[in-house]
């Protein structure tokens, strides 16, 4: 705000009058929703108010008040900044400064967010030459009041100094840098309607560079100039209108400048457009899908327009480089170009051929504006007959089966909408958001991310990322089978019903239509049906139980199916969100793969033989550590079979080395080390057992910002708890070796205390979880052998959640035998193996479930 004295009664009256007029306009917009009328009306209202203040300040007629930026073009969003320039003559009285300052202060007092500058014409030109942002703002300058002659002199000087080529280069670079800030995708969970790729700023950038080049300042003028077609101009106007309306509604809903379509506002924004929730889709998901389609269209058309403007500003010095396909395609300056605009109409099969050539031709880095435009205008050609054409089906399979370039080809096919035209069910999931707190990409982007992940396994340059996956895919015959499965694994999302079952039918039909038969077709369909199975077994079941492995091996059946499912599962989890995958999940999946492979190879999943094997391996490791030969017996004699099945040989050896001298320790033994699998800390606790032990340990982790990934709890025959935890530090980067000693000391001290369990901290939910809460679920049932009870908990993730659960269990003196903590983005699906007297009592079960639901409630 201005630094001058408090507003006068007259200023307050003007402010109230301005606010009332603006409020009336916003109310009309709420009902009529004509965004162009609103923006122009707000601009005129602001013009009139500033003129009155200008006159009241007695500023001389030799000055000019100029609107710049969006205000300059007469487009004010409800709470946009009002950018103004006070234009001074070259010779001016320094005494004017006080009056200009008073004018700016009074403008602020109107309630406007003023962005002001005071310059001479020469200063404007100098600033513009040094800063493309200033140059852009001045491009749309409009006189509000004051000297017409001075403003015209400024306009002439500005355009004389404007270098259209340099301006084009600077604005395109600026756009690329802006896109990079948004990860080069319009498919953000919370897109910025103005700044994100495919947003309003892209449309403005095109009009700026066109205006600077003298090609026109509206879509109609660019159409007349031949830079776009009449159809493209209509599409641009339609999507621009939607984006402007959406931005204005965000401002009105928020009551302030708000260009980010944040979770908190998505539902209200959707309702303002008339969207209503259905059984299959939230109102917000319907709005977001419309937004993504608009942003996608803007991105496509912007690419075409920028290439066309570039071609006019920078005429090519060389023409055709080489002919790629007779009567169809040439390479022109590294871009694939059709020989004339009628190629796709004469040869519909050339549409997919374009992507095959892009994929397979070295030196071709993209599609030219002419080719992109022809694709954009060929939507009617891509009909049922085109989809059924055997030539097109063969070309599509060739694209899938190339040794390289597949990911880029499919991304480009999606960007140009060709993929959705060829696979109609894929079109249904383009731009479909998944508010499941797990996926952070739209369904189509997730599918392409999974395809990309599988492809990276096969690329030598990326073999270091997941060497085991790269090794497996290197020996996997016909890996394109995996690519087809990736395309269809989530294609039925959002239809209602089981998407795996519905996707199977789509995959089966695709195989039949594309000549995929026998085991390849069977494997593709099976993968779509079971694409969630391996992650569910690895993350939610006790894989130390031979029966679990035996059942999973029966589902898989053979090594090829197991390898295919493993590769798809890793790629799928990694393609949901950068936060979901971690090395611990990778180890769970790899361990499940290896033990299942052994069973498929004839190994008997027998607990006794597995126990003997692990003990022998552990003893060999202990000998390397110079532990006396019989030193392990005192500890091992107190451990049950379950302990040896839940830990691998290296882990058994480490725990034995730590504890063999302390089997009857009077105080807690706590040891911590960086987890052998990386990115985590392994914490061992050995202490006399008590009912609240697990809860007490969880309380310590909660208070110190450590998240539990896995807990393996054992009770010795002589009453000691031997518990192992894998924990991560969630809030910051940390070297686990540096905090290991601190954890050992603090946790041992905590366990020596007799204080009652503290109240759980009710940590704040993320904005995503607050906006899209999931219904918490608790399920308690006996395991198949009746030995333990399995507790399943599903809820929004938040700090203190695990401890809240553990505390309820401790209050009922229920022991936790094992815990599998499965964090999926913003939600958790935790599994606990419980033991305790009375768990078979239905009344206790109901009471326990009720208290747990209360404890995990948001």
Swiss-Prot record:
The gene is glnD. Disulfide bonds: none annotated. It catalyses: [protein-PII]-L-tyrosine + UTP = [protein-PII]-uridylyl-L-tyrosine + diphosphate; [protein-PII]-uridylyl-L-tyrosine + H2O = [protein-PII]-L-tyrosine + UMP + H(+). The keyword Cell membrane does not apply. This is Bifunctional uridylyltransferase/uridylyl-removing enzyme. Residues 682-763, 790-858 form the ACT domain. Residues 325-681 are annotated as: Uridylyl-removing. Belongs to the GlnD family. The keyword Kinase does not apply.
């Amino acid at each position: 705000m201005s630094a001058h004295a408090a507003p006068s009664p007259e200023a307050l009256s003007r402010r109230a009058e301005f606010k009332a007029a603006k409020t009336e306009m916003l109310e009309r917009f709420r009902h009529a929703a004509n965004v162009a009328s609103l923006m122009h009306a707000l601009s005129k209202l602001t013009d009139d108010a500033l003129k009155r203040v200008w006159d009241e300040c007695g500023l001389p007629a030799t000055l000019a008040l100029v609107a710049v930026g969006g205000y300059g073009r007469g487009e004010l969003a409800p709470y946009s900044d009002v950018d103004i320039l006070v234009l001074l003559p070259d010779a001016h009285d320094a005494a004017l400064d006080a009056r200009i300052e008073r004018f700016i202060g009074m403008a602020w007092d109107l309630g406007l967010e003023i962005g002001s500058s005071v310059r001479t014409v020469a200063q404007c030109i100098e600033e513009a030459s040094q800063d493309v942002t200033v140059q852009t703002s001045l491009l749309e300058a409009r006189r509000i009041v004051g000297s017409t002659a001075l403003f015209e002199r400024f306009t002439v000087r500005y355009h004389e100094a404007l270098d259209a080529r340099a301006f084009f280069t600077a604005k395109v670079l600026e756009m690329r840098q802006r896109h990079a800030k948004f990860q080069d995708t319009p498919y953000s969970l919370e897109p910025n309607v103005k700044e994100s790729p495919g947003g309003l700023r892209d449309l403005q950038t095109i009009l700026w560079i066109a205006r600077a080049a003298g090609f026109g300042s509206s879509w109609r003028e660019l159409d007349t100039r031949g830079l776009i077609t009449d159809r493209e101009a209509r599409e641009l106007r339609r999507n621009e209108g939607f984006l402007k309306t959406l931005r204005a509604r965000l401002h009105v809903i928020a009551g302030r400048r708000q260009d980010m379509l944040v979770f908190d506002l998505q539902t209200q924004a959707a309702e303002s457009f008339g969207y209503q929730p259905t059984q299959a889709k939230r109102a917000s998901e319907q709005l977001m899908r419309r937004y993504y389609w608009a942003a996608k269209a803007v991105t496509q058309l912007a690419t075409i327009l920028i290439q066309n403007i570039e071609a006019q500003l920078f005429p090519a010095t060389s023409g055709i480089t080489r002919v790629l396909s007779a009567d169809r395609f040439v390479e022109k300056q590294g871009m694939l170009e059709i020989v004339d605009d009628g190629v796709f109409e004469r040869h519909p099969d050339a549409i997919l051929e374009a992507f095959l050539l892009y994929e397979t031709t070295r030196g071709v880095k993209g599609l030219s504006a002419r080719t992109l435009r022809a694709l954009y205008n060929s939507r009617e050609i891509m009909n049922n007959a085109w989809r059924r054409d055997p030539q097109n089906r063969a070309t599509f399979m060739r694209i899938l089966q190339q040794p390289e370039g597949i990911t880029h080809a499919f991304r480009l096919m999606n960007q140009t909408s060709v993929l959705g035209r060829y696979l109609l069910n894929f079109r249904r999931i383009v731009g479909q958001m998944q508010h499941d707190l797990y996926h952070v990409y739209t369904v189509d982007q997730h599918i392409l991310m999974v395809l990309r992940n599988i492809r990276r396994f096969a690329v030598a340059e990326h073999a270091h990322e997941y060497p085991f996956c790269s090794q497996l895919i290197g020996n996997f015959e016909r890996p394109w089978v995996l690519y087809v499965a990736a395309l269809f694994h989530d294609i039925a999302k959002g239809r209602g019903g089981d998407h795996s079952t519905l996707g199977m039918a789509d995959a089966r039909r695709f195989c039949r239509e594309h000549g995929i038969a026998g085991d390849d077709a069977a494997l593709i369909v099976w993968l779509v049906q079971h694409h969630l199975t391996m992650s569910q077994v690895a993350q939610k079941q006790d894989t130390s139980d031979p029966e679990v492995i035996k059942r999973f091996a029966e589902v898989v059946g053979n090594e090829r199916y197991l390898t295919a499912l493993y590769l798809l599962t890793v790629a799928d989890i990694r393609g949901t969100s950068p936060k979901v995958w971690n090395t611990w999940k990778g180890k769970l999946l790899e361990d499940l793969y290896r033990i299942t492979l052994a069973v498929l190879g004839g190994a008997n999943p027998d607990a006794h033989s597995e126990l003997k094997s692990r003990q022998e391996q552990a003893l060999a490791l202990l000998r390397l550590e110079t532990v006396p030969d019989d030193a392990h017996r005192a500890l091992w004699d107190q451990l049950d079979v379950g302990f040896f099945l839940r830990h691998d040989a290296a882990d058994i050896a480490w725990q034995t080395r730590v504890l063999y001298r302390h089997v009857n320790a009077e105080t807690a033994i706590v040891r911590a080390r960086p987890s052998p699998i990386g990115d985590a800390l392994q914490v061992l606790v050995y202490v006399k057992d008590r009912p609240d032990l697990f809860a007490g340990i969880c309380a310590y982790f909660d208070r110190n910002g450590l998240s539990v990934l896995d807990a393996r709890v054992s009770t010795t025959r002589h009453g000691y708890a031997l518990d192992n935890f894998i924990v991560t530090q969630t809030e910051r980067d940390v070297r686990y070796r540096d905090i290991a000693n601190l954890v050992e000391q603090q946790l041992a001290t905590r366990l020596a205390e007799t204080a009652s369990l503290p109240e759980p901290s009710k940590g704040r939910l993320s904005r995503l979880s607050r906006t899209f809460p999931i219904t918490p679920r608790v399920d308690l049932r006996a395991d198949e052998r009746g030995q333990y009870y399995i507790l399943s908990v599903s809820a929004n993730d938040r700090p203190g959640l695990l401890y809240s659960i553990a505390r309820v269990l401790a209050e009922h003196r229920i022991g936790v035998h094992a815990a599998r903590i499965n964090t999926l983005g913003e939600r958790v699906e935790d599994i606990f193996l419980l033991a305790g007297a009375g768990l078979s009592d239905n009344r206790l079960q109901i009471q326990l479930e009720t208290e747990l639901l209360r404890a995990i409630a948001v």
